[in-house]
Amino acid sequence: MTLYAILFCIALLIGMAVSVYAFGTGSKRAKIFKEIYYSIEEVDGIGVIYTKTSEYSATLRFKNPCQKYCANIDGYYEYAHLMTALAQTLGEGYAMHKQDVFTRKGFSEDDGQQRESLSDAYFRYFNGREYTDGYTYLTITQENKKSKLMSYDPKKWNNFLSKLRKVKDRLRDAGIEAKWLDKQEATDLVDRYFTLNFSDKVFSMNNLKVDDERINMGDKWAKVYSLIDIDSATVPGLIRPYTDIEVNNTSMPVDMMSIVDSIPDAETVVFNQMIYIPNQKKELSRLETKKNRHSSMPSPSNLIAVEDIKRVQDVIARENKQLVYTHYNLVVACKKDVDPQKPTNHIENVFSRIGIHISKKAYNQLELFVNSFPGNCYAMSDEYDRFLTLGDAAACLMYKERLQQSEDTPLKIYYTDRQGVPVAIDITGKEGANKLTDNSNFFCLGPSGSGKSFHMNSVVRQLHEANTDVVMVDTGTSYEGLCEYLGGESIPYTEE
């Protein structure tokens, strides 16, 4: 009898295993990643992403125009106006999904160049030092009206390709060099977002364990912070593209969202910024309906709501502004041993300083993470994940800065940046891709013992390694030994 019972249990377990293998567990979460993409194909050098809900998407890679700590107020406004112009260019039925990625990595200078011993020693000193690197992607998505029957519309497809060309032309006219990701690059971006690994050349995927607070993946965990709670829109009534910080008792303008690139203990941060362009007439009609509903029930809160709606209607009528739906979230990945409360407290504190209170209701962690995949932004719930605002305000909440990186120039002089890693700078200002002057003369001034000779020896050595002729004029004989070592000619000044 015991043998029959054991055989029965074994048969039952085998049957359950076969059932799960064949039909799945019935859980939507188990299949959620299979329901995102249909395929990624290359069209005229552009990697076009097709979702299973029949949306088309393509992704641009570029660098934000404002360098960090540039204190360029005009640059912040120009970039915000550019994003607003892109939304107006795309028009109804399109979405912009901008992703700014920040990842911690170890410094490694492996360009394969042959260097002298001093230069090799210089780079060996910095090898392995951690710093933050940044990447910017902009995904353009065409919405597909949800229906049970999916069909190909050549008119919509041609309109999509036309909009892609217009977006790139608009960026080029603004002085931003952008490149469409091809099929391989788009696939790599999707895979790296899934693993939240943007630093390693070779990476692997792990199983996910999800709860209401975070997503566990391998040796790290990730948490999605939704910036705006639509039930209590705790954002400033008036915003601008920058904010002021105090530096040595002096006010300095920085990007309003500059706080997202310096979250403590974070290995990877992805700042998702989504803008959806709806039908303007329908949204204005809904606003009018809301205004009438509020005005029909007199109360202080309803009167304030009526005044706000009237103000928005006036701005739209006078300045031809655009209404958009937006969603912003931060995906923060940390190592397993990091206390989740530490980055959470930091994010809540820094955003509260600019009048934004992080949503406390982001319990749908997996859905927020999946809906932030490139090209999948229309999966965001239009009931509780998006909020309505003006296009200008939405652009102000976008990240506009880029981290310090080496200049594109054949004449590289290395200095360390604020993170303590070497970056190449063309101190002449005339050899790089961005030419600032046609005069390569420069002057080094400082009191005795301030390090002029140490600095100039390093600069001249690097110029010499770049096969550059150097003429130096010095009040003393500090560089006589250097001149002799490099085989140059020293001409001392005499009264005769």
Residue ranges, per PLM feature:
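Pre-P-loop entry segment of helicase/translocase ATPase cores
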Residues: 393-398, 403-420
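Extended, folded cores of ATP/NTP-driven motor/assembly subunits in large transport
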Residues: 3-401
